[in-house]
Amino acid sequence: MLVCDADEKNANDKRKMMLDNMGKETDYIFDEDKMTMLFYGRKEVEVYTYIFPDNDGSGNLENLLIDTAKIVYPQLLDFAEEYVGKAATIQTTLMREQDKNKAIVGCITNVMKPGKANQVSIADNDWVSERTIEESEILRRLNQEITKMCRLV
């Protein structure tokens, strides 16, 4: 499964760019029509893609996390947005929306897991839970794609 952020591109443009680059490797042959890769001329596997935040628009993982934070950490989200908004007036690296989103998520995760990476907080806290999968359309779409990829349906 190819998973990456769309960033400023939309998901289809990012997917096309990533898949075009896949065809340049020498160890496998990528068949875009079948969405399969043939490794060393022997093993054919399906290729799945998911482009954050929602497999459709622009953005990144942090857009998805902010969506789930609205559900499980609304007060921390409000504080983080206020802090990052004020910091953006003096820190020019926070001018782009995606950079602000990364900073907002970083603030929340560092409150819950001081000094730990976002991945640790995602694993240990409630960003992804039955509740957020049920209430967040973005997360529900990701869950459906992973379920389909793993052939659990």
Regions found by a protein language model. Name each.
Residues 1-11:
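Acidic beta-strand-to-loop metal/phosphate-binding motif
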Residues 74-78, 114-118, 148-152:
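Intrinsically disordered or highly flexible coil/loop and linker segments, enriched in small
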Residues 3-5, 20, 137, 144:
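Small/polar/charged residue-enriched interaction surfaces, especially the RNA/DNA-contacting tracks
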Residues 9-110:
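Activity-critical C-terminal alpha-helical subdomain
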Residues 124-153:
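Charge-dense, extended regions
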Residues 23-27, 119, 151:
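Glycine-centered secondary-structure boundary/capping sites
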Residues 110-130:
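Short helix/strand-capping connector loops at secondary-structure junctions
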